[in-house]
């Protein structure tokens, strides 16, 4: 972290247009794999004034009422009336989903499951840092918590004038790789037209910002920008078109780590854009939890139709207790990063994906879910169950 004295990350709420699209795409994925866990799903969503469009490629034996599903997601987020500019009950829903290409499918499916090839070529990154309790960079962690709190205050009625769309941004100051202060906070939230700016500013400051950000990191020179344009009544899909996969930095590490470019939402685990990025987080988090490094970034790459990664590399930015080369060796010994093995290691063939589509795919706490009698753990890639093994293997 020594290369930065300050660093900024942003997040967006579940009511942001791009996040509506992500949540719809993952709801479609969940609904299908709940009935057919080996389905192939690639679902993209577009939302704009009065309409939601789902497109992509799916291969499955399951039937799902996708129109009803799309409407439910939109309404559950909070777009349930024309008064807020978008109504899941009355918007148009267009379904143009087709079948997966047989050319792609023949590169993925194998007689032996463990030989399953990657669904595409690509490079994926995983990252962890010991600067927060969830081993995530502080700026993105705090940014997520702000918009998550905004949704809580809206849905509970604590701040009844809030509407679903919101964005946050946090600038942290670092000394010696440690967070020592928060220099700037931006929170823009959609609201109804009746609330005064003074009431909005005071409510957001007292009941959102001060409830989330550590008081010891705020100081007399911290800048607070609350709805800096003054008015944010028009929002959601009316204000901006929303598309799946347009918030990949929000979804990952807030820019602190590199990104391979592939989005996550709407993709089943055979797509390494998603599953290998989750595995990368799992590896990096266990390395940091084991005390092998204070920061760790892993890159994994794949060729379409090939099971074994084409490369694995590690960067601990000079914080490693052992060499990066030694850590690569440990990763190869203790983590099987073939696509099928990742799916087994992280138990990914369950309908766990819609919760990932807002407030970050990483830095979350694993929890149990039950869907149609199927009980499983979500966010398995956040476990640190291999930390002790890695520490012993490294001789620490």
Swiss-Prot record:
Task: Name the InterPro entries on file.
Answer: ADOMET_SYNTHASE_CS, S-AdoMet_synt_C, S-AdoMet_synt_central, S-AdoMet_synt_N, S-AdoMet_synthetase, S-AdoMet_synthetase_sfam
CDD domains cross-referenced by the UniProt entry: S-AdoMet_synt
Q: Which cofactor does it need?
A: Mg(2+); K(+)
Broadest EC class assigned to this enzyme:
transferase
- Broad class of where this protein is predominantly found: cytoplasm
A GO cellular component annotated for this chain's UniProt record is: cytosol
The entry's Mg(2+)-binding residues are 18
User: What EC designation does it have?
Assistant: 2.5.1.6
Q: Name one GO biological process term.
A: one-carbon metabolic process
**Pathway, per record:** Amino-acid biosynthesis; S-adenosyl-L-methionine biosynthesis; S-adenosyl-L-methionine from L-methionine: step 1/1
The alphabetized UniProt keywords are: ATP-binding, Cytoplasm, Magnesium, Metal-binding, Nucleotide-binding, One-carbon metabolism, Potassium, Transferase
Q: Where does ATP bind?
A: 16, 165-167, 240, 246-247, 263, 267
Q: Which reaction does it catalyse?
A: L-methionine + ATP + H2O = S-adenosyl-L-methionine + phosphate + diphosphate
| Segments for region (Flexible loop) | 100-110
Report the function annotation for this chain. Catalyzes the formation of S-adenosylmethionine (AdoMet) from methionine and ATP. The overall synthetic reaction is composed of two sequential steps, AdoMet formation and the subsequent tripolyphosphate hydrolysis which occurs prior to release of AdoMet from the enzyme.
The record's subunit annotation is: Homotetramer; dimer of dimers.
- Name of the protein in its database record: S-adenosylmethionine synthase
Q: Which organism is it from?
A: Pseudomonas aeruginosa (strain ATCC 15692 / DSM 22644 / CIP 104116 / JCM 14847 / LMG 12228 / 1C / PRS 101 / PAO1)
Q: Which gene encodes it?
A: metK
